[in-house]
Amino acid sequence: MQKKKPYGKTLKEQLKAGARDRLHKFMLADGAVRGVIMNGTRMVNEMRANHELGILETLVLGRAYLGAGLMSAGLKSNDRIAIQFDCSGPIKGLVVEANAFGEVRGYLKNVPIQIDKPLDNFDLSPFFGAGFLSVTKHLEDAKHPFTGKVMLKYGNVAQDLANYYLTSEQIPSAFT
């Protein structure tokens, strides 16, 4: 795939734009609360340009890219994490993978996403339908990958990732 650079023609312009995408980790209350803040505007815009996605497709896959980026904050060395949504709605599903270096890649299973009428809000649950979320961790020192699987409860990438953490890893979480 030929990667498109939506930010500037020169290397200097591209590097300057890339400097704005950041991942910040922090701890509060003597380590009782961990947090990650991410700015991934450039990453999502490059994803949109590379996959030639429309607004709805960018919204869906972009949220998954950001979720994978946030989840990659807990990885080390050559570890990878894969997020897979399999669902019955028009999206059909998506796959996103991230590594410990913050590199994210992914794709939608159904492009373009068919809509019956113009959207009047950002509720994407009708496009997901029923289905499952699988999170697979490929840890460098492990012989086999670890996979956790939960039913889609909300039809929302952020809420379903938080539900995965609560259900599968017993870690109360929030993605916003």
Where are the regions that the model predicts?
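General detector of N-terminal leader/presequence modules that precede the first folded domain
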Residues: 2-176
